[in-house]
Structure formats: structure tokens, C-alpha cells
């Protein structure tokens, strides 16, 4: 039996589903959930089955694919520029500080692209593959289903410098987080709080945690917002001057499940990285009521997350004749140039 996103629709309800379909269809005039119905009807099956297979040996991959989509969209829009390798024309975004030695899942996207090129040659963009993969990853981890607006095309360049400045840092305070989100067009408080909920599964490296354990903001003391018991545990996992690449679960309770436990953790002072805990521990912040609400009612979080994901997925998409449909997600397509020799013979090179 092939993978299908439809099995979870009844859980959402017909009325909500209808509203979401309308919202997704109207969110960008040229993107629509049924974009591949006629040209590649099994695109969800192909991508979903590969993720199911990958999860058997790599439980982290679902969170990694969601993060990859997030890091793509925050840099000049959702155009798969993050997937491009180095070339003579540009430096890859994979080398940027927020991605280097931490962004992962590229080989899985490659596998999806190969399978889709066999089934539907030249039809499905890498940008849409990444968008669909993030949605299915959330679904397979216990999260909601939503209609994904599709029809994006792929960038023909990468943006290394922008990737170094546009992506939110794990060391950001709340003001910096809001600015980073607003700069790309996500200016609702619910965008920030709901999308941060993507840290309800997955891992982070100790190098992004240790400053708040030992020398928070140069104080030579730990972050005072940290739960004391949690601080002891994190110091055990991430000793001072230890291996910065050691992985720690974002969520100590349900580390591989997409649920609302992340927000409960924040309320208990158990946010793993500074930028997460800032949502609840910043005095008087307008993010606090949303953290409380999402912690208390997972369905409210799921609805907010769906809305924010659709909004993020529609950041500056390339559509129509813009960009291209890459044959290989790691490189731009060969440029075809028509030339005429001295004898009047025309050829392509």
C-alpha cells in the first residue's frame, strides 16, 4: 500500500480541511495544492515512502528535513537554493555558519529527486520536494496534515552571504528573533511562536547550548531561566570545554514526536537553546500567552503551525518561467547555447 497523506484528513475534520484548502489556494496566486495532480499524481507517495524508509534507520531525519525547509525559506524565499553545492558562480549556503556541519538530509532529497525524475521527468521542482518532505515529516511524527501549496521553481544561484545573516541564531533574544522573522515577511507573533514549535523534535549540538550553561551573556554564570535540575542534566551531557558536536534532544520527554510538549518544557524552564526559552522567559512578552495556549491545547498549536507553515512556504516563490526545474538538486541545469558555424550549421552546446 502506497503512502498517502489523506489518511489523516478525518482527524482534522471536513470543515477545517475545506477552510485550509481555500487558504492554501489563495495564499499565492500561482501556488496551489493540486499543482501536480495531472503531471505527477504520485508525488506524495514517492516522497512519503522514502521518508518512511529513512526513518527506519535515522529517527532524526524528519526533524532535519523540516529544518532544511525552514533554512531554505529564510534565505531569499523557498527556492531550494540551500540544496546547491559550490560552483564557479557562487558559494553554497551549506558553508554558511547556520548550516555548516549541522544542516542534513541532502542525500535524502537526492534520493527523492532521482525517484521523481524516473516517474515524472522534469516535472517536480526541488523546492516543492523540500516543501512536501517537511509536511510529510511532521505528519509521520504525529503532527498535523495540511494542503501544501505547490508550483515553486528552483533558484539558479545560492546566497551564502545572506544565509549568514538572515537565519535566526540560537543565541538570539526575543527582539532579535522578532526582527529576523519580520525581515522575511513573518511579522505575526504567532508565526514566531508556532514555527519555533518545530523544535518539539530533533536534536541540537552542544556548541549551541554550552554558553548558557556556563557563561550566559558573559556573566560566568548559567542562564537564570534554566530549570536547576535541567541545568545539571545539560551540564552532564555538555561539559565545559567538551565535544561541541555532541547531540542533545530538544525535547527530553518526547524527543521524536511532533506534539506540544515543547511549550510545556518552556513553561518549566526546560527550553534547550536560548532562543527557545526567550519565548517564555522574557518578562511581559506577547509570546508568553501563546506558549501557554499551545501548551494547554495541542489542537490550537497545530492550527497555528499549519497557518505559519503555509505563510512561510509562500515566501518569495519562483513561479511561471522564473528559475528552473533542476534535474539534480545539487547543481543548476546545464545552460544550452545555440551557435552557428561558418557553414551555417546550427548546433547546441
UniProtKB/Swiss-Prot annotation:
Instruction: Using the record, list the residue span of the signal peptide; answer none if the entry has no such feature.
Output: 1-29
Q: Which domain of life is it from?
A: Eukaryota
Q: Which residues are glycosylated?
A: 86, 173, 187, 217, 243
Q: Which cofactor does it need?
A: heme b; Ca(2+)
Residue sites binding substrate per the record: 168
Top-level enzyme category:
oxidoreductase
Task: Write out the annotated subcellular location.
Answer: Secreted; Vacuole
List the expressing tissues.
Mainly expressed in roots.
The protein's matches in Pfam families, at most eight in alphabetical order, are given as:
peroxidase (PF00141)
Do you know what upregulates this one?
Responsiveness to high-salt stress.
Gene Ontology terms: biological process: hydrogen peroxide catabolic process; response to oxidative stress; response to zinc ion
Q: Does the keyword Calcium apply?
A: yes
Q: Which reaction does it catalyse?
A: 2 a phenolic donor + H2O2 = 2 a phenolic radical donor + 2 H2O
The EC number of this protein is: 1.11.1.7
- In this UniProt entry, the residues modified to Pyrrolidone carboxylic acid are 30
Cofactor comment: Binds 1 heme b (iron(II)-protoporphyrin IX) group per subunit.
* Ligand binding (Ca(2+) 1): 72, 75, 77, 79, 81
- Its chief place of residence is secreted
What is a single molecular function from GO for this protein?
Answer: lactoperoxidase activity
- The intrachain disulfides are 40-120, 73-78, 126-329, 206-238
Q: Where does Ca(2+) 2 bind?
A: 200, 251, 254, 259
Which residues constitute the catalytic centre? 71
Under CDD domains, the record lists: secretory_peroxidase (cd00693)
Entry GO terms, CC: extracellular region; secretory vesicle; vacuole
Misc remark: There are 73 peroxidase genes in A.thaliana.
Can you say what this protein is called? Peroxidase 22
Recorded source organism is Arabidopsis thaliana (Mouse-ear cress)
Amino acid at each position: 500500500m502506497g503512502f498517502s497523506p489523506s489518511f489523516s484528513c478525518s482527524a482534522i475534520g471536513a470543515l477545517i480541511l475545506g477552510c485550509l484548502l481555500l487558504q492554501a489556494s489563495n495564499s499565492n496566486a500561482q501556488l496551489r495544492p493540486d499543482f501536480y495532480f495531472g503531471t505527477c499524481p504520485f508525488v506524495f507517495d514517492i516522497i512519503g515512502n522514502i521518508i518512511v524508509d529513512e526513518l527506519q534507520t535515522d529517527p532524526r531525519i524528519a526533524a532535519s528535513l523540516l529544518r532544511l525547509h525552514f533554512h531554505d525559506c529564510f534565505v531569499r524565499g523557498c527556492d531550494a537554493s540551500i540544496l546547491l553545492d559550490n560552483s564557479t558562480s557562487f558559494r553554497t549556503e551549506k558553508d554558511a555558519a547556520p548550516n555548516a556541519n549541522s544542516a542534513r538530509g541532502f542525500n535524502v532529497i537526492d534520493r527523492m529527486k532521482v525517484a521523481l525524475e524516473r516517474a515524472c521527468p522534469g516535472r517536480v521542482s526541488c523546492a516543492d520536494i523540500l516543501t512536501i518532505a517537511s509536511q510529510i515529516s511532521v505528519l509521520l511524527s504525529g503532527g498535523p496534515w495540511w494542503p501544501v501549496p505547490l508550483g515553486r521553481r528552483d533558484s539558479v544561484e545560492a546566497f551564502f552571504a545572506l544565509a549568514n545573516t538572515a537565519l535566526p541564531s540560537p543565541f538570539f533574544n526575543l527582539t532579535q528573533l522578532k526582527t529576523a522573522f519580520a525581515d522575511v515577511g513573518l511579522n505575526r507573533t504567532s508565526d514566531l511562536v508556532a514555527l519555533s514549535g518545530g523544535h518539539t523534535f530533533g536534536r541540537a549540538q552542544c556548541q549551541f547550548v554550552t554558553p548558557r550553561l556556563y557563561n550566559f551573556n558573559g556573566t560566568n554564570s548559567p542562564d537564570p531561566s534554566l530549570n536547576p535540575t535541567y541545568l545539571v542534566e545539560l551540564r552532564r551531557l555538555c561539559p565545559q570545554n567538551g565535544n561541541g558536536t555532541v547531540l542533545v534532544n530538544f525535547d527530553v520527554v518526547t524527543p521524536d514526536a511532533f506534539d506540544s510538549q515543547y511549550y510545556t518544557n518552556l513553561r518549566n524552564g526546560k527550553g534547550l537553546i536560548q532562543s527557545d526559552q526567550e519565548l517564555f522567559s522574557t518578562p511581559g512578552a506577547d509570546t508568553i500567552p501563546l506558549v501557554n495556549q499551545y501548551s494547554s491545547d495541542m489542537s490550537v498549536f497545530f492550527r497555528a503551525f499549519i497557518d505559519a507553515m503555509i505563510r512561510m512556504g509562500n515566501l518569495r516563490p519562483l513561479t511561471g518561467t522564473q528559475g528552473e526545474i533542476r534535474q539534480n538538486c545539487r547543481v543548476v541545469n546545464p545552460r544550452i547555447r545555440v551557435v552557428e558555424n561558418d557553414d551555417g550549421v546550427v548546433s547546441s552546446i
